[in-house]
Amino acid sequence: MNKNGNFKSTVGFVLACVGSAVGMGNIWMFPYRLGQYGGAAFLIPYLIFIALFGLVGLSAEFALGRMAKTGTLGAYAYCWKNKFGKYIGWLPLLGSLGIAIGYSVILGWVFRSIQGVLTNELFTNSIPAFFTNMTQSFSNVPCHFLVLLVTCLLLFTSATNAIEKANKVLMPAFFILFIILAIRVSLFNGAIEGYKFLFVPKWEYLLNKETWIMAMGQAFFSLSITGSGMIVYGAYLKDDVDIPKASMQTAIFDTIAAMLAALAIMPAVFSFGIDPVSGPSLMFLTLPEVFKQMPLGNFFALFFFVSVAFAGITSLINMLEAVCESWQNRFHISRKKAVLLCGIITFIVSVCIENGDIVGKWMDVVTIYIIPFAALLGAITIYYVLGWNALKQELDKGRKKPVGPTFKFLGKYVYVFLAIIILILGILYNGIG
């Protein structure tokens, strides 16, 4: 057993992994890309890549963690077994810390938006002015601090127990709230135009290479394959759990979350005659304008931002857990000291990049360069340094039927090759995730 404990159930493990995977990309990027790149036609390459990355990408990271019985730094040292091994894992760990720093800033905006809804400040003032004020340097420190306080308090106690309990509450709540939003939105006049945007297939887009590139990037980043975060969750996994099955369940629920977001967001946007966009503008400018115009808008705006907060907190938990677990073991410090140190560093750095332009550039560097390279490093480490025989032995635990040669081919040759392509295309396209 890992000294931080084990997940008590497969359900708890899967929900924790879904919590890590479901994040801002599902909410502010997937709905737009689904409509922009061919509607239902986009789902064909997207589902292919989700299945592939879920099966051989997630499974590999889970298996490495369970085999090594430790997270990022220890797992890479376990594989490389040389004097450089203890240093190799620092790059993926830097990716986890870097994305956590930027993510905490964005979650601070979500918390500030919740406050704006509760006080009615969001709707009584100009929405663009509210957003501009919120994203200035040092303008959102209290909400930003609250984000990290909540997350660190959840991580302070026994790791697996806190993570499992938090995700068993927050992830079902996320799905329930978005289902309610999707049902309400379906009753709007003009919602049909949003459904057409999302689901009327434009088959010619399948001949467009950009459709496949964006589907691949969306699927890859949506599953939190970073060469770090999912390894630490694997380290907390019992030997009797079927890893490939749990990986596919994670991929399925992540896809359902993305589809729910699309069903709740785009029909609402079209109902009020607003042009669809992606990214922070969709969440913090377009959707508040929709809520402002609709009956009971405050109520549904609160529903929406609370749902986003749930998804964001569960993702941030995983990012910080990867760092805390590694620091615990590398520096031989208590869990509370590791969490406190991680929280302080994250807060200090993230406060300095609160400005919307600065955090945008920060996230670009992390998501275009660091995380794709770290994910590639993880893929090579698992499939070539650790090797197929050791990986297969771990994957077969808890299964009635052993994994076959198809898994080896998809992982060792297709997945690793695509990880290289994702890194290159991300740089060429200035981001595909």
Task: Pin down the residues of each PLM region.
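Membrane-interface "cap" regions at the ends of multi-pass membrane proteins
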Residues: M1-M29, G57-F62, R66-C79, K83-Y87, ...
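Membrane-embedded translocation segments of transport machinery
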Residues: N2-F7, V11, E164, K168-I313, ...
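Inter-helical loop and helix-membrane interface segments of multi-pass membrane transporters/permeases
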Residues: N2-G5, Y32-Y37, M67-L91, S104-A162, ...
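Loop-to-transmembrane helix boundary motifs in multi-pass membrane proteins
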Residues: N6, G12-V14, S20, F138-P142, ...
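Transmembrane helix-loop boundary segments of multi-pass membrane transporters
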Residues: M29-Y46, W80, N161-L170, K245, ...
